[in-house]
Amino acid sequence: MQYGYFDLKNKEYVIDRPDTPAPWVNYLGSPEYGAMISNNAAGYSFVKSGANGRISRFRFNSMMALPGRYIYLRDNETKDYWSATWQPVGKPLDSYKSVCRHGTAYTVISADYAGISSEVTYYVPIGATYEVWRAVITNNSDKPRNLSTFGFVEFTNDNNYEQDQVNLQYTLFITRTSFEGNKILQHINENDGKDATGSNHRERFFGMVGAPISGYNGNLDSFIGPYRTYSNPIAVEQGKCTGEMNYNSNACGALQSDITLQPGESKELIFVLGQKDNAQANEILASYEAAGKVDNEVEALKEYWHSKLNHFQVSTPSDAFNNMINVWNAYQCFITFIWSRAASFGSGTRRRKDPLYAVCTGRQRRRSAAGQVRPQRRS
């Protein structure tokens, strides 16, 4: 069974069947901000440490990978809804088409369903400590379409992955969310360790530019609904976020926008996720109102990685071997090196020679990130 192929020219792996045997994952980010994303947009994000800097949830070894970076679409005339990636809604593949292009530190997932096409580009800009999801939604039908879009992320309640998952007597009581302008803000331990600006540097935000926000949720249970899953959130099914915020429960960021597309018309929505305070988030979101910013950042990302990979090239009679050595093996080595090979959990310590051998041909002039300290249990 074939699920995809290598695009040698663009240095991408193309997945043209979304029902892969397991999630096929790409890396996004830098030493300061990292993210993992599957071909169906599952995955998580972290600041500096996958163990102690987690800002969005991911459940390992679950029934396929959940949750992730989801954008839901709803036709308000038919009340039918789907997601801009095959999962989590999971429409039948005889009517839903999806293609994922995993590139060098970016992923593009396109979909086509019910006369509406979408293309979502996920990436972390060079030098930035936040991530961007740019969604372009197009009406390919011959009539106007009234749609609602829902961008969704499930926040962790603690930076520490283990604490967030198991120490519920603590983590459920230290977080709240609020809606400010065009974003959801999450506040963690808000009375702990504030600096002169009033920030404890543990605020997260999920914002959107490109269209007015018509609804929002900061409480996970109110967005998903009782006895439901990511595949059928009550807010999406009913076509309306309730505006409920989180206090002493599980947090999320959900932003709704209602749009009307004429035949052939497209709409661009830009979602941004990161660990920033309100003022920083406002500045970041305002910068994405500039036309062409996303295209310029993605092009800069490609140029950066492609030039790095071109430092060392092999040539053999096998194009497949050349591609693996020149692109994907090298890219894997670089990313895991700068994350100390500990994106998920652990101390981040490894033997010294193998990571150095892995990146020396690419002239990587960076010291590996400091070893992460294993978390201590808090009461």
PLM regions with names:
Residues 1-364, 373-379:
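Anionic coordination/interaction segments
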